[in-house]
A protein has these predicted regions:
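Beta-strand secondary-structure signal
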Residues: 6-8, 85, 129, 168-170, ...
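Well-ordered beta-strand positions in beta-sheet-rich domains
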Residues: 4-8, 137, 157, 187
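Acidic carboxylate diad motif detector
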Residues: 52-166
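Positively charged, helix-rich recognition surfaces that bind polyanionic ligands
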Residues: 3, 17, 148-151, 163-383
Length: 383
């Protein structure tokens, strides 16, 4: 069984320079691969795969262009991984699974430094530090979070990333499969929404964290800092500001974005952990059409803030870890319109109606009624 662990690291100045150089090289090679294939397509030539491009880059392009020799200075496995990512992006585009790959812009795109275990000395982990290829020993801020290799845990691979001037490492650890006893409790249904994050059929409701005072204050501060950044760009055109001041202000904005994102992620993690601790035999959720909801300009911001996809992904991981069956009901299943008492479908039930009232006399909150119907749904797919 493979499990990932992500935590913040505290690299030295020399290690930070190496990380930034490697990430910059990976971004350049990724963009170069995209641009090269775009040129081949415009000229009517055959598409070049990631493996063919890697051979051409190392054996033909760099030897014939001495000014690009700095590409060789970066960690080779990280550069090769960036080419593979570009090839994957093109493959998804050809299968009509995503749009045409975009070029990664410096400071705005999420580029990571990939590393893999090459020998027995690489990827060793102790309680307070981790050995990363080309970087050496790097100190971990959260001591004891990553399983140590002294206890028999094996680190297969990992990535180093930078967000808002903070450095993180994510490692993939091979852990033994644990035999989990069957959960004797009944199943539960979870209805996700915008008013509240999750309404559970056992009566528990997880509020929308974005409506809390803490998030609202941070978003207000973020808008203020973004206006300040916008003014600095305007002053730069007039010659009244400098790039250094803009970089400082951009870092302030990035840190606020990162802080808000961490609060939302932490709330999702704690909510899922609390749900799983009840040890249900199964959990049923609805397959929401998030991409369709994002097209509504009045709802897109609220939908993105709730992070429905992350909730489902992490819930599945926790269910797999604890031996709980995760059931997914079709998006067209009328969970909100079905009376949980008599089973009648109320076709004229509107989104503005918050209370479900049936002719049989059953009265209940629409979201809780939907959670009960999801729990008792008979048509589903196992995630």
């Amino acid at each position: 069984m493979l499990k990932s662990f992500k935590t913040e690291i505290n690299p030295t100045i020399e290690q930070k320079i190496k990380i930034n150089k490697t990430i910059g090289t990976c971004r350049y090679v990724y963009n170069f691969y995209l641009g090269h294939n775009k040129t081949l397509y415009d000229n009517g030539e055959k598409f070049m795969t990631g493996k063919s491009f890697s051979v051409w880059l190392n054996n033909e392009y760099i030897p014939n262009n001495p000014d690009k020799i700095w590409i060789k200075e970066a960690y080779s496995k990280a550069v090769k991984k960036s080419i593979e990512d570009g090839c994957t992006a093109f493959t998804r585009f050809f299968k009509h699974q995503s749009a045409f790959p975009n070029f990664k812009k410096k400071g705005k795109s999420d580029v990571k430094m990939y590393f893999v275990k090459n020998n027995t000395k690489d990827c060793r982990c102790e309680r307070h530090r981790l050995n990363i290829p080309t970087l050496g020993w790097v100190r971990i801020k959260e001591k004891g979070y990553i399983p140590t290799t002294k206890d028999g845990w094996k680190i297969k691979s990992g990535t180093v990333s930078v967000k808002a001037d903070r450095y993180y490492v994510s490692v993939l650890v091979e852990i033994p499969d644990v035999k989990i006893a069957n959960n004797s409790n009944g199943g539960i249904g979870i209805d996700l929404g915008l008013k509240d994050l999750a309404i559970v059929s056992n009566g528990k409701t997880y509020k929308n964290i974005n409506k809390s005072t803490r998030i609202k204050k941070l978003e207000k501060k973020l808008r203020r800092e973004q206006r300040c950044l916008s003014r600095k760009y305007e002053n730069l055109k007039k010659g009244e500001s400098t790039q250094k001041n803009i970089q400082k202000q951009k870092l302030k904005v990035q840190r606020l974005h990162h802080k808000i994102d961490n609060i939302r992620t932490d709330y999702i993690n704690k909510s899922i952990a609390e749900i799983v601790k009840t040890k249900p035999s199964y959990i049923t959720i609805e397959n929401l059409n998030v991409s369709g909801m994002m097209k509504n300009r009045h709802l897109s911001k609220a939908v993105a803030s709730q992070k429905f996809y992350e909730f489902r992904t992490k819930l599945k991981a926790k269910c797999d870890e604890n031996g709980i069956e995760l059931r997914v009901v079709d998006r067209w299943y009328p969970s909100s319109k079905i009376c949980h008492c008599c089973g009648a479908i109320k076709k004229d039930f509107k989104l503005s109606d918050r209370i479900f009232r049936c002719d049989c006399g059953y009265v209940e909150d629409r979201d809780f009624n939907a959670a009960l119907n999801l729990r008792d749904a008979l048509t589903y797919e196992v995630a």
